[in-house]
């Protein structure tokens, strides 16, 4: 028998679809051109340079920064890198006796204390930039005191029995100036103003006639663009320029708040607060348990702000000072008063978003939202290192 011939199976030729030849340079170049053309025809904000995105984010307020950060990863990274959140002040409470002062963070409300014998037999007059402006109870001596660094800056005796006093910037600055004012009724109403600088040997005092009807309720003093401002409940904003010794009260249209001018609020406890933030002026009226009314000065005219136009602002008001913050996302659209709430577990606040006090039932028994035993004070970054 003849042997069977061996059978050799030849492999089929490779399919054109299975071939894996590298693309030619011309094909790769054409693909890159097509991808580039698609990007040009359909641009994406995600493709912007990170430096440009950061410049855009820097122009946005915190609320808009957070919204824009949700667009994509590159916008989120840029938004977080430039995001600035304001630091809220703390509540400082003065003891009825002794030298142990209480400090509370309005968010966490944990009690901290400082023993400050330097403030014995003194009363507070004003606070800003972390400094207290104090006056000795037994004399007319006034002085600056920083409760955290314990620094004291003495001032010459102030002979004016002032009603309001304030300072322009930290007393360690060469530009710091103090203003004390007193309204004096008479046949011709007048205002007496005294100014001083840290390091000066005396106060400079002047009298100015004022044609305003002296009103029972004045706001606190604030400093804005080389002038001190004050507001009275009758609706008049007046100012003093210390360099030129210029007193002025025709600087804005009168503001007629219904809490002051309508009879239904006649017997309610009221207060008025003036607030400055980055050169802008705000006025707030409170009236018993009614919603606080906030106005902003636009081109010398007052405009009432609503919940939507407040733009997330947070107010901190006290008998001695008023503060405003723009970038506090967890405290936005609120007013914090320098008064303890029920069982001293929090401070009284009002939410414009919820249109109510916190909590509503607590407020029924109160008239004075800002008692003279407490104020808001700016704290250093390492504030917890200073406490007992």
UniProtKB/Swiss-Prot annotation:
Protein name (database record): F-box protein At4g00893
InterPro entries: F-box-like_dom_sf (IPR036047), F-box_dom (IPR001810), KIB1-4_b-propeller (IPR005174)
Top-level taxonomic group: Eukaryota
Region (Disordered): 1-30
Pfam families: Beta-prop_KIB1-4, F-box
Domain F-box: 42-88
SUPFAM superfamilies named in the record: F-box domain
